[in-house]
A protein has these predicted regions:
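Mid-chain, structured segments of secreted extracytoplasmic proteins
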Residues: 2-56
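Short, charged, low-hydrophobicity "junction" segments
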Residues: 9, 53, 152-159
């Protein structure tokens, strides 16, 4: 496994190869290396080895890797590395795969959280509606991930949803970060140019939080 015993030298060499190929900036070399990693990924069964290869694809992969990486999004052991690799690839196809996987609600809460975090990291606006539909989870950690993602990808269309969640949380700091997510979304909406909506939300938040004794 990567990092253990005799394989550590192999890991070091492969990491060096990845960085060398990326530094050269030659597309043919990058594509050939990515395809070699994809073939290796299909042949190995060890979780750590697969995760190591996926991390290399995170560094040099492009659209040729999306289909294969998508197949690991429902695997609890590899959903994290796969989701992070797709978010790093950042192509339209990679983004669509992340959103489509979340829409299917397959996998487990753990794999869904990994996908949601990747969506938040790359700020995929197309995920807004599916994330809104996931609000209200009894799993506090899931709710936290959904709220954080909406604060990163949302628009004025999500203001009322996050306002309601923040109000329910009493406008105070708690495990799901509802109030912080709402404030972050207001800032995002302001940056998007929807000034009136952002100002209205901010004023409403100030009024209600003051009434609740939180300011």
């Amino acid at each position: 496994a990567p990092g253990k015993g005799s394989n550590s030298n192999v890991d070091y060499a492969l990491s060096g190869l990845t960085h060398y190929v990326m530094a050269k900036g030659e597309e043919n070399a990058r594509l050939a290396t990515a395809n070699a990693y994809l073939k290796a990924l299909d042949k190995v069964s060890d979780r750590e080895t697969k995760a190591f290869i996926i991390r290399q694809l995170q560094l040099l992969g492009k659209d040729e890797c999306v289909h294969t990486l998508a197949s690991y999004l429902n695997d609890e052991n590899l959903s994290g590395p796969a989701a992070r690799a797709l978010s790093a690839i950042r192509t339209d196809n990679a983004k669509k795969v992340l959103v489509a996987s979340l829409m299917r609600r397959s996998g487990t809460p753990k794999t869904q959280k990994d996908i949601i975090r990747a969506i938040a990291d790359v700020q995929i606006a197309d995920a807004e509606n599916v994330l809104k539909a996931m609000l209200g989870s009894s799993d506090e950690n899931m709710q936290k991930e959904v709220l954080y993602a909406l604060s990163r990808v949302g628009s004025k269309a999500s203001l009322s949803d996050l306002a309601a969640v923040a109000e329910k949380a009493g406008y105070k700091m708690e495990k799901t970060g509802a109030n912080e997510a709402y404030i972050a979304l207001i800032k995002r909406v302001l940056e998007q140019g929807d000034t009136k909506d952002a100002e209205k939300a901010a004023n409403d938040l100030l009024k209600k939080s003051t009434k609740a004794g939180m300011t």
